Amino acid sequence: MAKQATVDTTSNFSRRALLARAAAAGLGSFAMAPSSPALAATVRTDFSKLPPYGNGTIPEGIRSRQVANVNGMTVHILEAGYETPGRPAVLLLHGFPELAYSWRKVMPSLAAAGYHVIAPDQRGYGRTLGWDDSYDAGADPFRILNMTRDAIALVYALGHRSVAMVVGHDAGAPVASWSALIRPDIFRSLTIMSSPFEGAPSLPFDTANGAPLLRPAVTDDELDAELAKLNPPRKYYQNYQRTRGANDDMLHAPQGLHAFFRAYYFYKSADFKGNKPHPLKGRTAEEMAQIPTYYVMEKDKGMAATVAPFMPPADYIANCKWLTEAEVEVYATEYGRTGFTGALQGYRVRRGSDPRSIAEMHTFSGRTIDVPAQYIAGKSDWGVYQTPGAVDKMRNSACTHMVGFHLLEGAGHWVQQEQPEMVNSLLIQFLRDYAKP
């Protein structure tokens, strides 16, 4: 049975006002680094002025609240299993364009299995505060190592020294994976969903003794240049996501934000029968052009126009059990309030797009994920194969203790929402077999 999530109510400051206060206090660019504890404690919002969270669709036993002093932010979380102190923790990290809400169908079962289940709105998303919502503010705080600090700080703020399992879906997968790679003492096991983890980038090795230099990977810009030569011309979606105009394109979609989310989620789900993913031979324009247009877009279209033709019919919408109209409205309401800029910032500093991020990651060259790990995705999810070779790297080198690789029937990209019972079963069995509190 669903109920309205409870929320905490505190003082009312906007993100931009907080930045101004930080600058006035001589603290420099608040968005560029974690703030002082004193400042972080003031990063609040008046939740009573926001629409009730979850549109009445939050399952029984899940609560919504704010957690202050988390790497310079006040983080909004959903949590379950909080009633009993001392439970081992499970941390769930969502993707794009998602929210903590995306884990609503997974959390009750994990709590019933004996865990304190924590799902935050990640930096840039939803009701989490403490980041600048301006494109011009820059994306440095969204680099992967700072997002990893976010995860550690949240775990500590909630009174845990470790978590039994960290789970990351889509854009949350690299955060979860890097967390397990860097701090295996905290993140004791790992579940990767949808986006395979290729491992830390490699530094040249043994070159002083004549070993060849590493062959550079095809960059997104190089791929885009080749995609533009196709007929019709195409472009890689992550380059689009990095543009200034991506926020307005989606936020002000001509079809309306609710219809945008409905079409976007349908197009990437198993319900769209055109999703028939398979391994690609390489990261060439010809191979990548086989991927649907939500990943390899038509060059002259934004995402709103890309998904508009894939709006499902009314009878499908009325009978869609995994994503009801009330649930779609939760996403439309939250993103309608915040926009997409914060959620898109991570794409600007992804590996391969930002030299400074790559330089930071090179610190961990040669390091592997050694905690127990598993991979879960939908069988109809092109996210598995959109980066050719990534699955093999994850299974053969990035993770030394990969104990499960699961592609689920009847699921596309939104695996934990499309097939929650199967996902729950895999997560709980994995915890029983491999996780250490």
Label every model-predicted segment.
Residues 64, 117-119, 405-407:
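Conserved beta-strand scaffold positions in the cores of enzyme catalytic domains, especially
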Residues 78-131, 169-171:
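Conserved HGGG/HGGXW glycine-rich cap/lid loop of the alpha/beta-hydrolase fold
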Residues 43-65, 75, 83, 89, ...:
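Flexible "cap/lid" subdomain of the alpha/beta-hydrolase fold that forms the substrate-access gate
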Residues 11-17, 27-45:
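N-terminal twin-arginine translocation
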Residues 70-72:
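Glycine-centered tight beta-turn/hairpin loop motif at sheet-sheet or coil-to-beta transitions
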Residues 22, 106, 179, 183, ...:
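Hydrophobic residues on the short alpha-helix immediately C-terminal to a glycine-rich phosphate/catalytic loop
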Residues 1-13:
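N-terminal secretory signal peptides
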Residues 402-437:
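Catalytic active-site module of serine/aspartate enzymes centered on a nucleophile-bearing elbow/loop
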